[in-house]
Amino acid sequence: MTRNTGTRNTWARNTWTLSADHVDLRRPVRKPRPVEIGALPQRLTLDLARTALVAVDLQNDFCHPDGWLASIGVDVSGAAAPIAALASALPGLRAAGVPVVWLNWGNRPDRADLPPGVRHVYDPDGASTGIGDPLPGGSRVLELGSWSAGLVDELVPEPGDLHVAKHRMSGFPGTVLDAVLRNLRVDTLLFAGVNTDQCVYATLVDAANLGYDVVLVEDLCGTTSPGFCTDATLYNVRQCFGFTTTSADLRAGLDTQEP
């Protein structure tokens, strides 16, 4: 009798095949699934078999009118802007076999792993409502397992989706994100989420520096920052790190894939 080491794993892509007296170290071979999409600065051909979507920080504290940002007077409409487009794009990506990774802030209740520089961003004067502090509704800002750190209701994870908690602007330092992506055997990352110019960008840059191909999906990202911040981010992504596309271009490519 043989058994694959990934039989309990929805995304069993980095596995061995085992029997009582033999171990086959060959990984499963997936047929390439190329699709061509419009992008900048050049058109792209993606291999869907080696692509994942990373959706960043689409959480109540950033996007919901009862969340942390709104409670301190920030207009969250910019952060909420990509939610409907992402909800519309997800079924096609999942049907194409693209893994969805939800990458969200999720801090320890004791904040023991947060250096002063990170805490200062969210509480610059030491007297404001910052990470881990209670909100009027009782939830604590970006605390793992809280309503505040939860995904917005409009985005419904499916059982095969993956979840990674982060505690920096980038999703890589001190997290399992790189290990998860390596085990998925993916090379190309599509980026969605908020804020375009902050956590999405920081994670994208780290991903590029780790050797991943990075593609920012413009209308699946949003921000509460001034417009010039998005302009600068898109320029830098195209100039220094990777590519940008839109959900319409992505959908057009998915529609042409072979069954």
For every predicted segment, state its role.
Residues H64-L69, D113:
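Short, glycine/acidic-enriched capping/hinge loops at junctions between secondary-structure elements
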